[in-house]
Amino acid sequence: MSPKRIIPRQRANRDIDEAVDYYLRDAGEKAALGFIDALDRAYRHIARHPATGSPRYAHELDLPGLRSWPLKRYPYLVFYVERDDHIDVWRILHAERDIPAWMREPEGT
């Protein structure tokens, strides 16, 4: 099976920008680049093996098909839904946040 295309939503891209800004400001360029590399590895894994993500929050939030996958060495989770022809990335959130509250945040904010 060939990898599916990863399509992050606008809010997911903002999450990434915020995380990179945080690492640049508080931990330096090396940490920020490491975050980007970890996200790229997570995306590649999800593209090839979308069913391996955890469905935990799908049940908690009543969002069928929602899965999450952790970034290695960074405390972030990628939240996504597998579609027929792509992976729909909803959010990239710090694992210590109130995930249900952040997932309910409207897309336009």
Per-range role (PLM):
Residues L71-T109:
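Enriched for short, Lys/Arg-rich terminal
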Residues M1-L66, P100, G108-T109:
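Basic, Lys/Arg-enriched alpha-helical interface segments
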